[in-house]
Amino acid sequence: MDLRAEQQQYNPYRIFSRSEWAKLRDDMPMTLAADEIAALRSMHDRLDLTEVEEIYLPLSRLLSIYVASMQRLFVAQRRFLGIQDRKVPYIIGVAGSVAVGKSTTARVLQALLARWSPGPKVDLITTDGFLFPNAVLERHGLMQKKGFPESYKLPMLLAFLSDIKAGRAPVRAPVYSHLTYDIVPKSWIEVSQPDILIVEGVNVLQTGRLPRDGRAVPVVSDFFDFSVYLDAEEPVLRDWYVKRFLALRDTAFHDPRSYFHRYALLSDDEATATAIAIWERTNRANLEDNILPTRPRATLILKKGADHVVEQVALRRL
């Protein structure tokens, strides 16, 4: 969908072409070297100096304005209430389909924001660690719905974010292995009072059903101060997923510890057919039923073309 087409009706977003958005960088300095940018790029994603300059530096500048505004509001509220409250981290959510490039975007933002003056502490977690272990998913018949909302330990994720917002430290998050495709037992990431926390995951903008009794039911995005949705057309996403699957077949799948080790010796045709089947059965269904409907809840939408380059940017009006 062309985001500009929606401007024929009332639209809560301001839509920018790539060139229009790039001009909003103003004097935001480039703080990453070419080799650092290359290290931030995920497999089969595209990230270069131009993409950082034209897309991510304007976003970094925008976020610096939002964060500073939130800090001023926090100080004013504390003065109004007459209390000395703990520092409240600014939380940024990064959402979007499998294979769209969420991890790359999250890492780039972490690198850029950490180099603001005077050097804020910027942490990054993914919601993968809050998935149920494979044994639990298998027991409940949910392995084919891994990544769907029901496959996550939602109360645990909500408790984690609540503790972060409350300024508690340290707060622990479980570790997920993409090699074994499972939670790593007795392994944790510790987050200790960051200035900014980036939370990346497919369903972080998901809403819950409204309760009939009127009681508040928190959702993950309730804890976000800003959110980014990575967008691309479904056929493009499928193509990226298939290409990534083929690349992993030639690399990570050859590790005997890999959950997908059984696919390591597939031919190109067999691997392509397998990847398409997985996409249609799981990832496309999750995209259409759970992920795409949350796009209108994002603060900012980055729309990518088939070459992985951001073509349009939509910023929610205040």
UniProtKB/Swiss-Prot annotation:
Positions binding ATP in this chain are G96, S97, V98, A99, V100, G101, K102, S103
Q: Which UniProt keywords apply?
A: ATP-binding, Coenzyme A biosynthesis, Cytoplasm, Kinase, Nucleotide-binding, Transferase
Which is one GO molecular function term here?
pantothenate kinase activity
- Give EC number(s), comma-separated: 2.7.1.33
Q: Which InterPro entries match?
A: P-loop_NTPase (IPR027417), PanK (IPR004566), PRK/URK (IPR006083)
For this entry, list what GO says about its biological process: coenzyme A biosynthetic process
Q: Which GO CC terms are listed, alphabetically?
A: cytoplasm
Q: Which Gene3D superfamilies does its entry note?
A: P-loop containing nucleotide triphosphate hydrolases
Q: Which SUPFAM superfamilies match?
A: P-loop containing nucleoside triphosphate hydrolases
Give the superkingdom in one word. Bacteria
Asked whether the keyword Cytoplasm is assigned, the reply is: yes
Report the CDD domains cross-referenced here.
PanK (cd02025)
Where is this gene product found? Cytoplasm
Q: What is its main location?
A: cytoplasm
Q: So what does this thing catalyse?
A: (R)-pantothenate + ATP = (R)-4'-phosphopantothenate + ADP + H(+)
Pathway involvement of the protein, from the record: Cofactor biosynthesis; coenzyme A biosynthesis; CoA from (R)-pantothenate: step 1/5
Class of enzymatic activity (EC top level): transferase
Family from the record: Belongs to the prokaryotic pantothenate kinase family.
* Protein name per the record: Pantothenate kinase
